[in-house]
């Protein structure tokens, strides 16, 4: 807006086209390149320093040192200089402050210092030295309240003295030239032009930047300085305390690496920036000379007090990299593309298996034949002492996840059985028993005999052996002093150990026979159920592994054989990632296993290493059916609003995962819709707006009765975010739901300088920022001011048309009458759920004829008669189906037989490509399957509710808060 010429054709005053030179082109005044002319001209020898100089207020006194030159250094000061070329003699040089826009105008700030008066510096040059320096120039900052007053006086003075009025005030005043007396009287017309120009330029003036305009006047024949040379304009000078004038600098980031998929939150501290004029740029210079760049995602509400930015990383150009990629990150100002010094940033490959489920599945599976190769290791399938599969005796190389060397189990492969010992009278031969722990720790190797004493002396039928705990020994038991005692003791313990081994072998043999008879694997598991508490190198128990490898029946068998004994210990056992079996069942999407675990008492309240409960995990993955199972548990209620380690509730994660079904389940289960996440106080509605998800935002407002003006810790409402991001759809939705565009957050609207308070100017409390102040475009600004939302349609946006128009008005009336019955299984609300429009049920209830409103919505969204028939069939509503069938019966059909459902399905319907397009639109972000976007695009509530009622009220604020916001026919 500031770059447009406010005085062009069509304005109050017409441009004087007789002017032959382009007085409005700032590029005309090349600062340092000499003009191609034979006569006198003015040239800038040294530019002023652009940054680092502070504009001072009246109360602060003069500047400490004048405006330095561009080449000024600490020990070598320099100042702006100009030279009058091709001329020697007396001259007068004036310096005026002008704006930095495309069109040059007078600036309201004033030059102060030696030779300065009324904001203008006047210096004489010559007659010999035609170089003029300005060693003590200062810039006086005018307050906002006095901009118009000061600017009008400055313009009047320029017109009276003839100091470039046609250029700096208005083109219609170009005829006013410098006069010797300087006491010209202005006409009323000239004063009006000045006033209008001052009004317009006051609105557009940037108080943080100025330029110096140098104009030289040579004497005429009378000695008066009236011969004006073409002025020259310096580079821009930025106020050092203005946000857009400071040097950009990254001070600190809490992370310097992120995943290639982007979307990770980073906190960045920086020097002063302007929240609506800053970008965070990621870039990489490629080998072929190209440059990849991406920009951090944040809105003005994510910039805190001009010194901190919270943003999300962009996606890297290649998300399939196999090794880290180094890029750079820097701040960049939008207005002038000024950048900060780049900092390194590392993109690492995507970790697709964060829960390590796939890694564990990829382990080498145990091979059955490995158990018969060496003869020294324990056999598979129960052939060894503890029936460890996976090739797994302690003397062999245990298979991953199956050999538990840390327990130091001794091998018993040398034992054979004779008839008379087992049920089958198979004999036993006492072979050599090696009782040394070859795979155990050093301390355990010496204590194998002592450990055998820990076995129970007598086991009852059906109980397994106690687990050896050799590794807990810290010191070997003192042995007898004589060799004879030691040999006797060793012999006794060998005999005792052999006896226990035989008892254990007998039990396993019995279990094997029972399995052969019944075919029930639980017969084998029962004798080893005490070992289900053993964990592998990852901390996983057999129950963890069975779930990871999707063996649902094995999980059920394990739960059955351990029921009532050690069930609680293994059901809620955590692995090294703090995952319980229930966590893994949710992660691997096994609904039946989740139900089995809950039935035997799995604890929902246990959290994983990130503080996630099973509700968080189900919502994150969008498993609505599993989430439904979990929410049915009585123990789920206290966890619904429990935050995880990131401070997020399950409802927040459902929104961030774009899962409408999970969100609906949580709302129905009583989740606190207005709960704040613990980092910045955002509610689920804030997050839906932040993710530009109109579907979820509509669900929260319509189904969850979300507080539309809920605030974060810094007072930001969802409307602030929508306005700052320029989202017209969400701004319209929130405004229609009653959002207040005048709510102020805690971010100051402007930076109040301390000196203003000292000067008594602009005193008082600095106002906060409202959504109106943050409107990123005119469309949002108009919506916030009450203008109806009018979306711009493209060919891709046009909704596909269904065939509902084939139903006659009489048929529609009969259907609506049938759908108004109170039976919950056959009324309009149930049909709406079947048709995917259930989220609008609350809105439908506000209508005098909900069933008619439903049918109108369904037609607008491209619904077909086929889908309507299928929905009615699912409801079992034969009367409604017959009404539709009757509408398509021909006389011949009526005389012969009624039309079948299959025949109705053969009626003219929309093409398959059209239906596919409908499904794509419903699944996309732009058109939600909830029907909210459909309502925004096509639905006129004026037509669908009563036919003439203009408003549908959607009051989604707490009772007694604010005012109701109506949704009009067009938003």
Curated annotation (Swiss-Prot):
One of its GO terms (cellular component) is protein-containing complex. GO terms for molecular function: actinin binding; chromatin binding; DNA binding; DNA-binding transcription activator activity, RNA polymerase II-specific; DNA-binding transcription factor activity; DNA-binding transcription repressor activity, RNA polymerase II-specific; identical protein binding; RNA polymerase II cis-regulatory region sequence-specific DNA binding. Residues 646-680 are annotated as: Essential for interaction with HIF1AN. Induction: By phorbol ester and TNF-alpha. SMART domains: ANK (SM00248), DEATH (SM00005), IPT (SM00429). A lipid is attached at residue 59 (S-(15-deoxy-Delta12,14-prostaglandin J2-9-yl)cysteine). Residues 40-365 form the RHD domain. The record marks 431-432 as: Cleavage (when cotranslationally processed). Residues 801-888 form the Death domain. Generation of the NF-kappa-B p50 (Nuclear factor NF-kappa-B p50 subunit) transcription factor takes place both cotranslationally and post-translationally via non-mutually exclusive mechanisms. A cotranslational processing allows the production of both p50 and p105 (Nuclear factor NF-kappa-B p105 subunit) from a single NFKB1 mRNA. While translation occurs, the particular unfolded structure after the GRR repeat region acts as a substrate for the proteasome, promoting degradation of the C-terminus. S-nitrosylation of Cys-59 affects DNA binding. Residues 433-971 are annotated as: Interaction with CFLAR. There is a cross-link at residue 323 (Glycyl lysine isopeptide (Lys-Gly) (interchain with G-Cter in SUMO2)). The C-terminus of p105 might be involved in cytoplasmic retention, inhibition of DNA-binding, and transcription activation. NF-kappa-B is a pleiotropic transcription factor present in almost all cell types and is the endpoint of a series of signal transduction events that are initiated by a vast array of stimuli related to many biological processes such as inflammation, immunity, differentiation, cell growth, tumorigenesis and apoptosis. NF-kappa-B is a homo- or heterodimeric complex formed by the Rel-like domain-containing proteins RELA/p65, RELB, NFKB1/p105, NFKB1/p50, REL and NFKB2/p52 and the heterodimeric p65-p50 complex appears to be most abundant one. Component of the NF-kappa-B p65-p50 complex. Homodimer; component of the NF-kappa-B p50-p50 complex. Component of the NF-kappa-B p105-p50 complex. Component of the NF-kappa-B p50-c-Rel complex. Component of a complex consisting of the NF-kappa-B p50-p50 homodimer and BCL3. Also interacts with MAP3K8. NF-kappa-B p50 subunit interacts with NCOA3 coactivator, which may coactivate NF-kappa-B dependent expression via its histone acetyltransferase activity. Interacts with TSC22D3; this interaction prevents nuclear translocation and DNA-binding. Interacts with SPAG9 and UNC5CL. This is Nuclear factor NF-kappa-B p105 subunit. The lineage of its organism: Eukaryota, Metazoa, Chordata, Craniata, Vertebrata.
